[in-house]
């Protein structure tokens, strides 16, 4: 039987700290009314930056966990779905949040299609989900010790 490398708990904790910092910055935007958010053009760029970094962290940790298991994924969305299928995160949570992986791809590869309204709505609807990913990852990491 093949032996897989142990999780790098330090890496996971460092990435979670980064995610938490970015979510904290995003909470400033989520508490603004949309008109106020839209009025200052800098808000869009800052929000996009922090959201991309938070999502990159979520996906990097997911990929790290899966790299220690006999699982193959071909894209970011499969990372989230595989985590659900394996019970690392609840399957319904994975289904609900798989679009965050697609959103990360859109922010990176077709960023010009993302409106200020769309990025604002993501900060309104998904910051708690990003925080929940961190909780699930820490729970899983603790069980692996």
Q: Residue spans of the language-model regions?
A:
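Solvent-exposed interaction patches of small proteins and small membrane subunits
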Residues: 1-145
């Amino acid at each position: 039987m093949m032996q897989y490398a142990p999780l790098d708990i330090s890496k996971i904790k460092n990435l979670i700290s980064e995610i938490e910092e970015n979510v904290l910055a995003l909470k400033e935007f989520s508490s603004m009314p949309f008109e106020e958010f839209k009025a200052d053009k800098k808000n869009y760029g800052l929000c996009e930056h922090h959201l991309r970094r938070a999502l990159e962290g979520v996906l990097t940790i997911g990929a790290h966990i899966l790299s220690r298991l006999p699982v193959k994924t071909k894209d970011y969305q499969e990372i989230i779905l595989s985590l659900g299928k394996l019970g690392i995160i609840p399957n319904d949570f994975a289904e609900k949040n798989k679009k965050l992986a697609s959103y990360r791809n859109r922010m990176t590869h077709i960023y010009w299609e993302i409106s200020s309204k769309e990025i604002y709505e993501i900060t309104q609807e998904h910051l708690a989900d990003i925080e929940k990913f961190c909780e699930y990852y820490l729970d899983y990491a603790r069980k692996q010790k």
